[in-house]
């Protein structure tokens, strides 16, 4: 299994680091005693390969210091071994431990959540049937549904032990209405129709795509968006894990502008998105959808 990277930039920088590490002579296990007249050894952080040539790699404002702070420090001791990332391990020499990447992660597998109703008997959740499956259409802000971490596009596999495959939207809403106010047990799969794309701003603060009414309409040639495979005819669901569905383009651009250098978009194909939100008014999406920044 190959090593995984959040973005193409991370992959390329990681390859440079690994190539330089392999080319560097291995240090002997037993270090000879040096005469006092010789210069002292460089600090351990300088044992990393020289990454100065990456200063403006792929249009990024990328310095050796920025890359090295995202790498594991070499441990103290006489025996030092340079290790490569293991198969299936995610490594991010450029993105580092970016919170946006973590918040946007679409986890594999399924999980169980316990939902309740508020004092009005509401969960703050709307469901929509798509291709014989049941999906989250709307999560209202400051409701039980938002507090348990449900997101637009999550697939509901079971409600209180009943399989939801083949259910209509009406049957799903009826089941929620009849469910206990104290505890509703759901089995959920994270957003199967969506995927994430991690990109990096260039020196002018751009990642290289344009949106119209929340939909990606063009991608700039040679940009980080193009390099990382961002597609047109997809809607932006999240920016760094924050839901932006129903927001005006101006607000989405403001969120992108004020974000850090690493941008992770969660996107969904137009045909799926438009089916998911049919019969929902734009005002409902704009004013009631949970647009808060999720916990990691």
Swiss-Prot record:
Keywords noted in UniProt: Cell membrane, Cytoplasm, Lipid-binding, Membrane, Nucleus, Repeat
Pfam families in the cross-refs: PDZ
Any one GO biological process: cell population proliferation
All residue ranges annotated as the PDZ domain in the record: 112-191, 196-271
GO cellular component: cytoplasm; cytosol; Golgi apparatus; nuclear speck; nucleolus; plasma membrane
PANTHER family (alphabetical): SYNTENIN RELATED, SYNTENIN-2
UniProt-recorded name of the protein: Syntenin-2
The organism of origin for this protein: Rattus norvegicus
